UniProtKB/Swiss-Prot annotation:
Stored InterPro entries: Met_Synth_C/arc, MetE_arc, UROD/MetE-like_sf
Enzyme class: transferase
Keyword Acetylation in annotation: no
Binding of Zn(2+), residues: 211, 213, 294
Domain of life (superkingdom): Archaea
Name the record gives this protein: Methionine synthase
An annotated Gene Ontology molecular function: 5-methyltetrahydropteroyltriglutamate-homocysteine S-methyltransferase activity
Pathway participation: Amino-acid biosynthesis; L-methionine biosynthesis via de novo pathway
Keywords (A to Z) from UniProt: Amino-acid biosynthesis, Metal-binding, Methionine biosynthesis, Methyltransferase, Transferase, Zinc
GO biological-process terms attached to the record: methionine biosynthetic process; methylation
Keyword Nucleus on entry: no
PANTHER family with a match to the protein in the record: 5-METHYLTETRAHYDROPTEROYLTRIGLUTAMATE--HOMOCYSTEINE METHYLTRANSFERASE
Function: Catalyzes the transfer of a methyl group to L-homocysteine resulting in methionine formation. The physiological methyl donor is unknown.
Amino acid sequence: MDELPILPTTVIGSYPRPKWLREAIRLHKAGKISDEDLQEAFDDAVVTVLHDHEIAGVDVPTDGEMRRDEMVEFFAERLAGFKFYGPVRVWGTNYYRKPSVVSKVEYIKPMLVDEFLFAKSVSYTENLKITITGPYTIAEWSYNEYYKSKKDLAFDLAKVINSEMKKLVEAGAKIIQVDEPAIHTHKNEVEWAIEAVNESIKGINVKVVMHVCYGEYSYLEPYLDKLNVDQINLALKNYNYEPVKLFKKWDREIGVGVIDVHNKRIETPEEVANDLKMLLDYFKPEMIWVNPDCGLKLLPRKIAFQKLLNMVKGTKIVREELKNKGYNSTSLKPLVNR
């Protein structure tokens, strides 16, 4: 299907793991259950997540990234050139397995195709989104012990990510999201970081989204016209929508974050509807996709589900008003020739 309802609803990627999956992972690490049993638990979790998304009414779901611990670690474990020395403290008592690049980064084999095909086989819709961490974020969140510069590393990463994306398209992916939460970390690197993203999506003839969450959006604004994605996806609710004014000249699709993922307070449908009506003062209806600010994995599952449910309910309020004005659907086709 090449069309979605006006104001399509989606998720960013991650979703809370069910408690029983977390227990299965613990038991597997302790050697108490087999690899086969763990894979069955992952499969069951994906079915559960897609069921939650279906009941909530999400138009474009994901598999919740059930098989991924972290967004950089997952890919570093599956590419040549990376090594892990041990956990690094990020903040407080939170630790992260930060990878080190010790040799040339190279593509070995598909990393996401199997998980995409399984999710596709159990999904309630063919409009399933698959997410992949972008080249700049992997480079920024890794130790570089091999390349002359972070830029050189990012462009090699772009090549391997491009190889993976092409495999996903061959497998039937219709929507691919590049996650670049770090892209606006350093003002003087944004221009070439966007070039690296463009390199990673070259030749990808399906809808491509770039998700950018919390940070300095003003660093991105001067280079938006150089970005070759069909949609840019932003965290806005947590910022009280202040960054919106920076994207007034953006003329493609925009994913608007209307759910705060760092707050357990559940937004009401009316609140979501009012926020969307305000955003329609900035963007045409056919440009807007509706989503949470970021991934939902850190929230309790019941709260994450209720937030999604109310997001969809609020969107439907505005959708009905738009239908009365002649707006019915949004195209799923890519907007940019890459």
